[in-house]
Curated annotation (Swiss-Prot):
Family that this chain belongs to: Belongs to the AAE transporter (TC 2.A.81) family. YidE subfamily.
Matches recorded under Pfam families: Asp-Al_Ex, TrkA_C
GO cellular component, one term: plasma membrane
Protein's recorded name: Putative transport protein YE4162
MF (Gene Ontology): monoatomic cation transmembrane transporter activity
Keyword presence, Membrane: yes
Gene Ontology BP, a term: potassium ion transport
RCK C-terminal domain mapped to chain residues: 192-276, 279-361
Keywords tagged on the record: Cell membrane, Membrane, Repeat, Transmembrane, Transmembrane helix, Transport
Domain of life: Bacteria
Membrane topology, record value: Multi-pass membrane protein
HAMAP family listed in its UniProt record: YidE
């Protein structure tokens, strides 16, 4: 068997064994995707025992490409809501992430001085304890530049391997302990997150209002500012027995009934000006009007504003709601359409059919993945991650790397949605498949590389001590920040888990946190909110420690 075929076979074996281990449950808690790392360690140990030669270049490529796939799909998933989340809670989350990095650095410094651990070893243990491979690379580079002996620099990888497993398990353990200590109900936390940060808060309400203000009599709809705002849509007007879709030029009369859509606060403002809320049905049943939901798939309308389509004037059809990535938005005239947007329409059946043709409504397109934007995004991400950032006094340039670059680009592209005929929408099933494939490949290779000397160092060397140091570097910051965030900041548990995973730049921990609730995106959103800054600080921190302690 060729080296390439053998390498692929070993990776498949690692994935099967690791996923099986990940399904084991102890008191309802399992390693999940993190089990792949231990599958890799087991297979790696026996591969070295039986002197199996694997293709090193291929393993390196698979490890990096798997990580790129994982972080890119995470960015595409959370991109639409990332920047709004950053404005709402990003400062608080990133402050906790900074605190975690600082506490981890202090614990590392104390262990280094208290137990006289060689600087290269403690930096390797530190990188493994915080599960950050780019930090290991940065530490190796700066120590080499500072003149550290090559044999000590090479031992950093073993320190990393010793600390990495507990770095993976430790964060899962802390999440579990916080859940037990605070007696947290995950379903309740998910509902609370939805109500305060997204779905339920953004769910639109309706109100039927009777026109009682005589000052409005004789005015057209476009002459009433509140009825033309970006916060409220008037989708139906009832006059006597006639139900119609109001156009911008429709004249308002006293006694008219208006069906309004918007958030409660905005609806109340309109009610105060227009008249009073009434319990009158403005249903389309038994009328010439009907309602329908259509999806935007036509590339020709992507990026266009609802005003520019002029659907009301052309087809006598009103867009009452716009659902984007599970969040309902007011279909204001200034709203731009993105691929996958779901529109609620009101109008005559033939008019709705015409509007459906305009926006696309091709359901099968939602199951297709445009591969060109995927590789454009990955390529741009790799380029961004490769840009060096030179800081005076640091001999090694800082980089976002292959993990940070694709994530940042994916967040931006996910927020933009589309450029011309290119759209970055990805069906949830395809996104999940690529994400899981990426993290399995990454952890399989990390486990294989660590497994060879793992047992020998653990049993005959200083492996146990290194594991202990790593456990402290992992556990103390996580417990400190986790308890503070829950007790003082009253942080949502799922948001907290995502923040902890992002602060540790730990994809397996995010996979575990995502698995705590099947539908909530809270963990992924907070992970992406803190990840870019945390990655930068994780890359900088071992370099700062190396510079500080090299001369001491």
């Amino acid at each position: 068997m060729s080296a390439i075929a053998l390498t692929v076979s070993m990776l498949a074996l690692v994935a099967v064994l690791g996923l099986w281990i990940g399904n084991w449950k102890v008191y309802g808690v399992g390693l999940g995707i993190g089990g792949v790392l231990f599958g890799g360690i087991i297979v790696g140990h026996f591969a070295q025992t039986y002197e199996l030669v694997l293709n090193g270049d291929m393993l390196h490529f698979i490890q990096e490409f798997g990580l790129i796939l994982f972080v890119y799909t995470i960015g595409i998933q959370v991109g639409p809501g990332f920047f709004s989340s950053l404005r709402v809670s990003g400062l608080r989350l990133n402050c906790f992430a900074i605190l975690m990095v600082i506490v981890g650095g202090l614990v590392t410094a104390i262990i280094h001085k208290l137990f006289a651990v060689p600087l290269p070893i403690i930096l390797g243990v530190f990188s493994g304890a915080v599960t950050n491979t780019p930090a290991l690379g940065a530490a190796q580079q700066i120590l080499t530049d500072l003149g550290s002996p090559p044999q000590l620099v090479s031992q950093m990888g073993m320190g990393y391997a010793m600390a990495y497993p507990f770095g993976i398990c430790g964060i899962l353990l802390v999440m579990w302990l916080i859940r037990l200590f605070f007696k947290i109900n995950v379903d309740r936390e998910a509902k609370e997150f939805d109500s305060s940060h997204g779905q339920n808060r953004e769910l639109l309400q309706t109100m039927n209002v009777a026109v009682r203000n005589p000052n409005l009599h004789g005015l057209s709809m476009q002459d009433v500012p509140l009825l033309n705002s970006d916060e409220v849509v008037c989708s139906r007007l009832k006059r006597g027995d006639l139900l119609m879709v109001p156009l911008s030029g429709t004249v308002i009369e006293l006694g008219d009934y208006l069906h309004l859509v918007g958030q409660r606060e905005a609806l109340e403002k309109v009610r105060l000006v227009v008249g009073e809320e009434v319990d009158v049905t403005l249903s389309t049943a038994s009328t010439v009007l009907q309602t329908a939901r259509v999806v935007v798939t036509n590339e020709a309308v992507l990026g266009k504003k609802i005003r520019d389509l002029n659907l009301k004037q052309k087809y006598d059809v009103a867009i009452t709601r716009l659902n984007r990535a599970g969040i309902e938005l007011v279909a204001s005239n200034n709203a731009s359409l993105q691929f996958g947007d779901i529109l609620n329409l009101v109008g005559r059946p033939e008019s709705i059919e015409a509007v459906s043709a305009v926006v696309g409504n091709a359901q099968q397109k939602l199951q297709q993945v445009q591969m060109l934007p995927v590789f454009i995004g990955v390529g741009l991400g790799v380029l961004l991650g490769s840009i060096p950032l030179f800081i005076p006094g640091f001999p090694a340039a800082l980089r976002l790397g292959l993990a940070g670059g694709p994530l940042v680009v994916a967040l931006i592209l996910g927020r933009i949605g589309s450029i011309g005929k290119l759209y970055w929408f990805m069906p949830p099933s395809a996104n999940l498949a690529l994400r899981e494939l990426g993290i399995v490949l990454f952890l399989s290779v990390v486990g294989l590389k660590s497994g060879g000397d793992f047992i020998n160092t653990l049993v005959n060397g200083d492996g146990l001590a290194w594991i202990g140091y790593g456990a402290m570097i992992t556990g103390i910051p996580l417990l400190t920040v986790g308890i503070l965030a829950r007790m003082l900041a009253k942080m949502n548990y799922l948001t907290l888990c995502g923040m902890l995973a992002g602060s540790m730049t730990d994809p397996p921990a995010l996979a575990f946190a995502n698995g705590l609730h099947p539908t909530s995106g809270a963990a992924a959103l907070s992970y992406a909110t803190v990840y870019p800054l945390a990655m930068f600080l994780r890359i900088m921190s071992p370099q700062i420690l190396a510079v500080l302690f090299w001369t001491l």
